Amino acid sequence: MVLLNGKLKYIAVVAIFYNLIILLVKEKFPYICTKKKFHAISNRILYEYLNNFVSKDIFRREDITLKNLNFVQTNLKSDKDAEIKENRDTQSVDDNMFQRVYKFILNFFYGNKKNRINKSMNYGKYDNFNKINDIFEFMRNNGLPINITSVCLIDTGLNIKDALINYFLNHDISTYNSYTYHSVNINYKKPDSFNFGINSENCDEDNYSECESTFLENHNGHGKYEDKSTIQGDSLKLIEKKYDKNVDLQRSGIDVEICKAFNNSKEKKNSLNIIPVIKCLEYCKTKNVKIIHMDYNINEQNEQLIQIMDDLKNSEIFVILPSEKLFNEKPYEDNSVIYPSSFFEKFENVFFIGSLDYSDMSSDDADIASNFQIQKNEYLKYRKNNVFLLDSINSSLKKRDDHDILYYEIKYSSAFFINIITIILNIYPNMSIKELRNILSYSIPSKETAQLKTENIFEGNFDINKFIHILLNRGINSSGFVRKYKDVTPNESTNKIFLLEDQKDADIEPQKDSSIDIYCDEGGSDEDIVSTSNGLDVYSEYSHSNNKSDQLLNDEKGLKYETYKDLYSVKENDIYVFESNNPTNSSFMQMNYDDKIKSKYLDNLEEANYQNHRTQFEINRNDNRYPIISEDNLRDRQNMHNIQMLNDGINYSENANNIEELYDNDFEDYRGKDLNPEYNKIRDNNNNKNINKEFGILNTWRKNNEGLYLSDSEEESQPFKWMDMHVDDIYQDRKKRLKGNNYDNRNGRVRRIYEDNKRGRYIKNRNMQKKKNFDRNLKNKRYLNRRTKRHINEKNKRIMREKKNKYNNSVLKRNEMKSHNNSQKTPKIIPRKYSR
């Protein structure tokens, strides 16, 4: 600056000033100066801060009923790249003077840049569900939800005074512009009339068919908190993707049906009969919904109610009940007590969801009532610092001034559970209830307290982070399952039954003594492994000591002996052991029995998979005629023959991929028609006609040389020595036919001549092109006289002649060496492995 004159000083000062202004504005308002950058693969947005939760490989279920069948592979930036990006201000040495001045000023006024991290990356104690919403948003933006799930909500009606629900019904951005929600079948007509639900709160046995109405409004506005949380769920959000002036609105993944079954008044809502609930359940079933949520827990038995619950179970409809807000004919309710549902242990499609408000520090304990203790009013003490089944929503659902949401936050658990199931059903609409329970069982960690272990009605804590990890990362392997082990004495009582009102004492069903491993079947009963393995006694005399062959036989016979652990069948003293014999990256919803049964035959080249799954292979044919053959010897011999015959273009069969499949495809028939009459007597005449064409021409030759083969008695003791002779004979016969036609020599000579000519033409054309380019460049130089040009041309011609002679000599020498080697080559002799 000192060496510059006045005009240049003015220009330098102005340039520095404007550079600082631009840098500061760019940091403070980045959307003004630069376009927002994000990685996209086929319009699928990738969030870089979800590295720890989202797997790089997202698998789609390949099903013809789904719309998307492709495989999406996302390459997210690693955490190391993010750290480098954060520390770039101190580590970069390529910054110019203006950038260094800008960073100094920025750190001076705003502090260190490292402490300013994206808010979406800061997941604190009460931001757990914000993290989950980000993951769900990632799934939706990447095209994973490919279906729409219908949900029926049974409660006290809609609070249309609420700003969010009012916006949800009116679709008016000016009313509630902070949210962008949308539903397919909810159309708002007028405040007291809706066309997406019914009102059955006035139904009874007399007017059961004529009690429906369309008035769904909640008078006092204290109801439908679960519906509001469902609407707030990520599955209903509408994503706006702006491309220039066009706006692409993504369709939501849920349909909502409303049924008002409970009265708004707190004094009457618990004293009503069960008829409105039954009416709403029937209405939801007629709407072909997939999920039904009731705002109140039902702890009552009714024949008509049980019948409709059976219909819902047969229709594969999920029913979700909260743990609190007990509903029965008695005017009694205590929200501080967690009651079980009367359907929980009888219907596998019923999910009993509850949560404990561990954020409330005013009380340390919560009351939990079991089935046999409801009439006695005796409750167990359970500490609130342990989450029950599902995390409470806490303050993450609180929006602006909606303080009532924070007050009812412990009741959002069942509603938020709807969003979880909706996300799964949007991706896999054909998933069964049992498959979902198998998935959820992996998301329930072990019970932490002894008080909760004593109650068989409660399953344990539900870890939502573990569930999301299973959903997006690896999922449950198709071959992985949970085995159930028990160690219960006969004196211990584990299974408690539901008590009616007239019963005073509980009939305790004793548990059978079991000191061995037992499994749990579909109905939750225990089944002894030894008792189910009686049908496999035929193979017991050939089994090995390591019991791995027994496992193979169980897989071949079917999977009915290996039942899988369900969420509803959890009892006390259970130990969950995750076993995965085949840890492969597969979709977590592929839980069908057909997917778990691995194929008997594996590829020859997959040595690792073969050795991991089957260490021994048993061959039993024709009433156990052949003994058990060691797998290693069998595979080594087969690999040796495959390599020998593939080099000469000889294959066993078009459909035989390995030695086991080859042995099962009537391998004895390849020997010929009359070589072994005992085999032909057992087999049908049609099987003798299905001889492979590759070996059929050798029948006449083998008839004349029958003495070279083994006898029947020798073949029983050494069955595979005949196979070696068979392979050797095929090889020799094939060699003779190839030499007779002189195919090998003629084809090789023509191929070598063609390759030499092709390379010679290529080199000649390349040299000619170089010469032309060189001559053209020389002629363009005008400072050279005619004599100099002539000398240069003569020199070039001499060089080209030398190169040509050198190339011809090398080709001639190479041909002489080939002819010399061919003349000295001796015919290949393959020794016979067995001779008489």
Curated annotation (Swiss-Prot):
SUPFAM superfamilies given in the database record: Subtilisin-like
Catalytic reaction annotation: Hydrolysis of proteins with broad specificity for peptide bonds, and a preference for a large uncharged residue in P1. Hydrolyzes peptide amides
EC number(s) stated in the UniProt entry for this protein: 3.4.21.62
One of the record's GO cellular component terms: plasma membrane
Active site: D155, H222, S414
PROSITE patterns named among the record's database cross-references: SUBTILASE_ASP
Disruption phenotype: Ookinetes fail to traverse the midgut epithelium resulting in a reduced number of oocysts in the gut epithelium of the mosquito host, A.gambiae or A.stephensi. Gametogenesis, and ookinete development and motility are normal. The capacity to infect the mouse host by the few sporozoites made in the mosquito host is not affected.
Gene3D superfamilies: Peptidase S8/S53 domain
Matching InterPro entries: Peptidase_S8/S53_dom_sf
Covalent S-S links between cysteines: none
GO biological process per UniProt: proteolysis
Key word Hydrolase present: yes
Region (Disordered): 802-836
Residue ranges that the Swiss-Prot or TrEMBL entry lists as coiled coil: none
Locations listed in the record: Cell membrane
Keywords: Cell membrane, Hydrolase, Membrane, Protease, Serine protease
GO molecular function list: serine-type endopeptidase activity
Role, per record: Probable serine protease which plays a role in ookinete traversal of the mosquito host midgut epithelium.
Similarity-based family: Belongs to the peptidase S8 family.
Protein name stated in the entry: Subtilisin-like protease PIMMS2
Species name: Plasmodium berghei (strain Anka)
This protein's encoding gene: PIMMS2
